[in-house]
């Protein structure tokens, strides 16, 4: 018995999500496009809204922020037309993540609030946990580490009660990053190891790649450069296979730091130039600021105070622009350590 077009579209969407989880991003995009083309613009609105949003998230995870934004906006149009509160709430949450990446934290917080309100009305418990986690990321950016940890812990407990391993791995990644920033390296290592077990059990190549990269940052911090290099290389190779520009840029930043720690300053500068170029089209202001901070560190190590100053001044402006007060204060101290002009 042949499938109807909506049934065929639903099957294609399922295959797209499976391909995405395996890291087969090009195949996933193609399957989403095939599904979207089959769906009727009058009768299949709920699935159309979901498919567009999931395709947008794939774009977002690859660093294609504007493409993600367009998909999310289209998804919301169809969600409004069919009256799906759940699809609307998910759409607002996704747009909030885009606003956060672009450094518009006020708009991001507004959208998270709207998403939470609609999700509550729709009874979307899992989404409320995701929003709680995302608000924790905002707090982390703003330097409210106690608040961020509380948000993460709340969402983690909710996802653990629901046996939602996928969501648990997301929250553990954010907790690991927070503990790395705070210098709680052993806790961060334990958190990342736990998350990696989950990601590998689920064959989730995307999450595993991100976790490996964030774990590499911990290895650098504790001086285990060989382990850091291996983790960074794994993440970079996987990201390049997926055309994941966001993770590629982050991995290049990490590799440049490893090179700097080993005294290969010229190579570190060359790697950072490639990374900065890779990051230019991503609209991720925080990542761009982190790249500039690294560029300043290596320039200072080379004895080039003028280049270091230029990079750190721009980094400080970017950190302040996204509300990252903790990082902006660190840059101010670095600038103060440079010799006067």
Where are the model-predicted features located?
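Eukaryotic tandem repeat interaction scaffolds
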Residues: 178-290
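C-terminal non-catalytic interaction modules
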Residues: 1-4, 8-15, 274-277, 281-341
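Conserved alpha-helical positions within TPR/SEL1-like repeat arrays
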Residues: 13-21, 47-61, 86-101, 112, ...
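Amphipathic alpha-helical segments of tetratricopeptide repeats
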Residues: 36-37, 76-83, 114-124, 154-164, ...
